[in-house]
Amino acid sequence: MASEIHMPGPVCLTENTKGHLVVNSEALEILSAITQPVVVVAIVGLYRTGKSYLMNKLAGKNKGFPLGCTVKSETKGIWMWCVPHPSKPNHTLILLDTEGLGDMEKSDPKSDSWIFALAVLLSSSFVYNSMGTINHQALEQLHYVTELTELIRAKSCPRPDEVEDSSEFVSFFPDFIWTVRDFTLELKLDGHPITEDEYLENALKLISGKNPQIQNSNKPREWIRHFFPKQKCFVFDRPINDKKLLLHVEEVREDQLDSNFQMQSENFCSYIFTHAKTKTLREGILVTGNRLGMLVETYLDAINSGATPCLENAMAVLAQCENSAAVQRAANHYSQQMAQQVRFPTDTLQELLDVHAVCEREAIAVFMEYSFKDKSQEFQKKLVDTMEKKKEDFVLQNEEASAKYCQAELKRLSELLTESISRGTFFVPGGHNIYLEAKKKIEQDYTLVPRKGVKADEVLQSFLQSQVVIEESILQSDKALTAGEKAIAAKQAKKEAAEKEQELLRQKQKEQQQMMEAQERSFQENIAQLKKKMERERENYMRELRKMLSHKMKVLEELLTEGFKEIFESLNEEINRLKEQIEAAENEEPSVFSQILDVAGSIFIAALPGAAKLVDLGMKILSSLCNRLRNPGKKIIS
């Protein structure tokens, strides 16, 4: 499990340097160490509106993000504070405090727009902080929302049906939370009490009228409702009436703060801790700290090069890095587990291959967990190839350990025989039979040696081969035997040697068969796990489409109630297209199976070792694999 990050205070994540947004290497290093999923809360708003105070509260500290006490904006760029999530185990809460919008000292007014867009792209909960009330002026100050269609793209290429790219924003935008500070109104509408959320809902209702001023005023309202999947509101009383204390509110004791403000702050923090979502990308891909760091770099590279930050492009860059790391992680897992579970030499090759199958299954699962968007299975092919080579290395280590052990045991068992040969003990009448008995005793004792491993017969055969010339010499010098008896003995020795050779050949053929069957099982496992992953990805895709549809239907109903026919018709067209997309995806013949077979074929043949890459053999194995997939209970290769 990833260790928790304990930062004593925030660090700068991005800053504007000479007209370029630059990422801080220290912040990237911190993010790269976070392998847990992250909940990212970003706060944006006009300078000197108390954004930093709320973020410090979320961090559980009075101080951290600089509050400042003058009309000058204190926070520059985007600052980051990573803390263990207080209510989601094994998650990290990342707080992003942003440079105050509208600071007149800024040389580049576009900087505000990019900070706003980055906060949207990086967060799972986007907090907009303002003062007073949500009125016409407050909505005008939120004009940055209307610029998002120019600053963010979902797809790298325009859609062929000419549908606005922004129609997909809701599938990856964060939840929108409006915090209203120093709120002095009563929460009432037409004389009836209303909730904070109802207050925001009413403020975001479109205004009737055709003139450009009204239409411009409606833009932020319309796009907050369209782009952000959920809207939430919190209002806060003034924290303290004493102006001097207010200037240093971070140093004021809790019991000196307004009781309503304390309760409102607690409610806000509680909501964030329990409802702020884990950061995800399209199709439910979880974002870790490491992935967030890569996203920051990718988005800033796009901005600084004059391009528009694009989610699809960012995910492609992320996939390349993460999938490569997933291959390494899976391969390391395989090596570690094999090293822990295998004791060399194994009694049989099958024993080693059985452990290999278990470790390989786990390694593939590791790869599937950490990889995404491996469309052509490029990285899965690399994993297959890597594990095939590692398996061959373990097979070789097993053979070497067996050979070394067996040779040592035979040397020990044959010491007396060697000494007797040197002393000429067997070069006497009847010496051949004495020699045969001594050799047989060595073979019998060798048979009783435990865990000799896969090279046991081969090493024995090599030993027996080394005795052929000696035995022939002893036989010929044995005067107790007639010429006929010597001929029969020589023939018997050759027959036994031939039988041993045949037995050794059969063992090698059996081991080749076991290796082939292990490869077949290996690729069945790859295909089975790939199939499950593709099905999960398809489910996530369908879930995403249905969530988009549900959100758009909700907005459509509201527009119908409010009587905005033009916007209603435009959104209705979007909804109809989305329904068609969902219907097409649901009715689509599950082509997953055929895709898997195609992929399996290319992976399987590409990873076959040496001579097995011959076309006939490769096609035979592929055919066997496909048949087995279609007939899971039937044994194909025999």
Curated annotation (Swiss-Prot):
It comes from the Eukaryota. Its EC number is 3.6.1.-, 3.6.5.-. Residues 311-638 are annotated as: Interaction with the CYBA-CYBB complex. GTP binds at residues 45-52, 67-69, 97-101. GO terms for cellular component: cytoplasmic vesicle; cytoplasmic vesicle membrane. Residues 590-638 are annotated as: C-terminal tail. PROSITE patterns: G_GB1_RHD3. Residues 35-277 form the GB1/RHD3-type G domain. InterPro entries: G_GB1_RHD3_dom (IPR030386), GBP_C (IPR037684), Guanylate-bd/ATL_C (IPR003191), Guanylate-bd_C_sf (IPR036543), Guanylate-bd_N (IPR015894), P-loop_NTPase (IPR027417). One of its GO terms (biological process) is regulation of canonical NF-kappaB signal transduction. The keyword Transmembrane helix does not apply. Residues 1-310 are annotated as: GTPase domain (Globular). Keywords: Antimicrobial, Antiviral defense, Cytoplasmic vesicle, GTP-binding, Hydrolase, Immunity, Innate immunity, Membrane, Nucleotide-binding. The keyword Lipid biosynthesis does not apply. Belongs to the TRAFAC class dynamin-like GTPase superfamily. GB1/RHD3 GTPase family. GB1 subfamily. This is Guanylate-binding protein 7. The lineage of its organism: Eukaryota, Metazoa, Chordata, Craniata, Vertebrata.
